[in-house]
Amino acid sequence: MTSQRTRDRLIQRLYEEGLSNAHVLEVIRRTPRHLFVDEALAHRAYEDTALPIGHNQTISQPFMVARMSELLLADGPLDKVLEIGTGSGYQTAVLAQLVERVFSVERIQALQDRAKERLVELKLRNVVFRWGDGWEGWPALAPYNGIIVTAAAADVPQALLDQLAPGGRLVIPVGAGEVQQLMLIIREENGFSRHLLDTVRFVPLLNGPVI
């Protein structure tokens, strides 16, 4: 269930679906997704589907992890990325292998504690975690070259726009219903450009930390 052939099949499927960043695909290939799901679901870890991780949250499908990572890195390597929604830590682990530093915010402490353990196990040491409200971002360490949000916001949080560096890219699902639009926002010299992309399904971005 975790064989190299199984992972290769997943990467081939992602490539056929239009993903083309070789570095992103290689990181997806070598990141052990089965470590980020419950043991009972490990046999489904390399399916291209979202899976439950408890607390009414999910681990994103590999396609969406790769897609959002590609969008974030489209202008080249980044040195400082803010992730809103640590969740299982899978997207965090992928980002940690693609950028210099990751700052990850999660409102559910139990999820973040487990994610920390997984990243330690994988010897990924360039991630700093914060337990808190994702709507607020992490202003103390701003600005960020890239911001990625792994839950859907009804509107784009102003705090995240404020924390985006000039030329920086924000990738976020936007919408209040079960179906949302993936949006790419770029901070330009005189404001922000917004680009509506894929139709997506994400859990909602909620307020307030939870133990």
Curated annotation (Swiss-Prot):
Catalytic activity entry: [protein]-L-isoaspartate + S-adenosyl-L-methionine = [protein]-L-isoaspartate alpha-methyl ester + S-adenosyl-L-homocysteine
Active-site residue list: S60
One GO location term (cellular component): cytoplasm
InterPro entries: PCMT (IPR000682), SAM-dependent_MTases_sf (IPR029063)
BP term (GO), one: protein modification process
UniProt entry keywords in alphabetical sequence: Cytoplasm, Methyltransferase, S-adenosyl-L-methionine, Transferase
Family membership noted in the UniProt record: Belongs to the methyltransferase superfamily. L-isoaspartyl/D-aspartyl protein methyltransferase family.
Protein name, as recorded: Protein-L-isoaspartate O-methyltransferase
Lineage start: Bacteria, Pseudomonadati, Pseudomonadota, Gammaproteobacteria, Pseudomonadales
Gene that this sequence comes from: pcm
